């Protein structure tokens, strides 16, 4: 959970409470806690808002968020080589888009 760990780290470094960031996102604190723990995925627009509020590069935050989505898609696959091969194929397809 790259994104959740990053927002928790930044929040703690900046001395912010979960409820403060939850209010900024207009969600309740338990929902924010789930996002931070990786139990729930933030929406793309929430990632952008968090990047702004935490004074972080939006592209970096979106990259972590999207990487988590990829990891979630393959985490139950037992054959890691198959996962790596699928990522390479997807990467090549993305380049051609």
Task: Write out the residue ranges for each language-model feature.
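Recognition helix of helix-turn-helix/homeodomain-like DNA-binding domains
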Residues: 26-41
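Short basic helix-loop element that most often maps to the first helix and adjoining turn
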Residues: 5-24, 49, 77, 82-84
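Short, charged recognition helix plus adjacent turn
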Residues: 62-97
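Conserved hydrophobic/aromatic packing and binding residues within compact polymer-binding modules
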Residues: 7, 21-22, 32-35, 61
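Short amphipathic helical patch at the helix-1/turn junction of helix-turn-helix
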Residues: 1, 12-13, 41
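DNA major-groove recognition helix of helix-turn-helix/homeodomain DNA-binding modules
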Residues: 26, 43-62
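Positions in alpha-helical segments
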Residues: 5, 30-33, 45-48
């Amino acid at each position: 959970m790259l994104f959740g760990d990053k927002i928790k780290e930044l929040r703690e470094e900046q001395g912010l409470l979960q409820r403060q960031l939850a209010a900024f996102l207009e969600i309740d604190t338990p929902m924010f806690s789930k996002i931070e723990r990786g139990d729930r995925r933030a929406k793309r627009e929430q990632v952008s808002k968090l990047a702004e509020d935490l004074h972080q590069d939006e592209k970096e935050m979106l990259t972590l968020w999207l990487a988590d989505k990829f990891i979630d898609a393959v985490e139950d696959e037992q054959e890691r080589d198959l996962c790596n091969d699928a990522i390479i194929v997807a990467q090549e397809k993305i380049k051609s888009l």
